[in-house]
């Protein structure tokens, strides 16, 4: 056992910067773990999570990082869709946005691709959640590593991230 005390949360849950941020904010959340494999990589990590955890793909969200030219911003959209970069730029008051290089996204977020969470990033980035999330009591997103998701109320997520909701998802 290490010298750091762990706060108690759902059985089997690992501690990541994402779960630490939720705990510190007092936000209720659930953790979901699944065996990550490379079999789903044509579909993406989020589709794998939805399939293995038995959730609708519209209720499971992926975290994508974009570059507006002056800053990096985070978009959180359903795994079943894509991110509208023009809409993301508009939501943060920028003229345009382009997808960040995966290596940049890993360095800027502190997470590996397939495990990037909008929570617990260092430094914090402006975050936009697709407004479709607001129809659910719980959405799933990466908990900070592959095979580990957190379930959280989208309104709680907006508050803890100081994020905005906007129509940034496309299907």
Model regions and ranges:
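Extended, low-hydrophobicity, polar/charged segments
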Residues: 2-171
């Amino acid at each position: 056992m290490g010298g750091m005390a762990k706060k108690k949360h759902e059985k089997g849950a690992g501690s990541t910067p994402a779960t630490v941020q939720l705990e510190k904010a007092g936000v209720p959340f659930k953790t979901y773990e699944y065996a990550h494999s490379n079999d789903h990589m044509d579909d993406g990590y989020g589709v794998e999570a939805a399939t293995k955890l038995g959730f609708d793909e519209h209720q499971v969200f992926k975290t994508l990082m974009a570059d507006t030219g002056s800053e990096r911003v985070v978009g959180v959209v359903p795994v079943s869709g894509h991110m509208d970069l023009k809409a993301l730029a508009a939501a943060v008051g920028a003229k345009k946005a382009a997808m960040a290089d995966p290596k940049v996204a890993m360095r800027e977020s502190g997470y590996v691709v397939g495990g990037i969470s909008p929570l617990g990033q260092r430094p914090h980035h402006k975050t936009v959640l697709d407004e479709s999330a607001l129809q659910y009591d719980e959405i799933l997103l990466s908990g900070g590593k592959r095979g580990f998701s957190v379930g959280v109320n989208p309104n709680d997520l907006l508050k803890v991230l100081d994020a905005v909701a906007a129509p940034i998802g496309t299907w």
